[in-house]
Amino acid sequence: CALMILFAGSVVFIDNATATLVLGLLGALSGVALAFVTGHGYLISSKPTWNTKKLPLAYTGTAAVAGGFLYVAIAAFAGADPAIVRALCWILLGCVAFSAVFSVAWLRHLGADRVRQNLDLCRWGIVVCGLVIPVAAAVALAIMPINAFFGVVAGFGLVAALAGGIALRVLMWVVGAGFLFFFEEAQANRSAILNV
C-alpha cells in the first residue's frame, strides 16, 4: 500500500518520470509476489482442490490484473506521460493473458462437476467479470486514445477484475472448505462424539 501511495504521489506531485517508473515497478512487483505467497499458503495436501500450483498462479494473475487496471487508471486520471500509460496498457494485456491461462487451468483442475455445482459463480464471477470484461477493457485501453473515457474504461476494468478475483477466491473456499460443517456437527453432538 505504501508503494502505491508513493506512486500516486509521484505521478501527481513530482515531475520525475524515472522516480514514478521505479516506484510503480516496485509496487507492482511486490504486489505480484505477495499474491503468489498468499495463494501458495493454501497448498494443503489434504484438500485436493487446493493442492495444485495452479491456485497460487491464478491468485497471482487475478491480483496482477486488478493492480494493472489500478495503475492504468491512476496514471490516466493523473495525466501521466502517454508513453508510460501505453507501456502500462501493454503490461496489463500480459497480466490479463496470464490470469486467463491460470484461472482456466485451475477451473479445469476442479473438474466439470465442481464447476457445474457452482455454475453462476464460475460463469458470472470468474468468466465474465474476471476474464471477459478485463480482456475487452485491456484491449480497448491498448488501442483507444488517451482521453477522459480512457479513465472510465480503466475504472470499469478494475471493478470487474476485483469482482472476478473475489469470485475465484470465493470458489476456492466453497469447493475446499466443505469439511467445515463437521466442526459444527461435533460441537452440536459433543457428548455423542466424545462419549461424555
Where are the language model's segments positioned?
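Extramembrane terminal tails and long inter-domain/linker segments of multi-pass membrane proteins
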Residues: 172-196
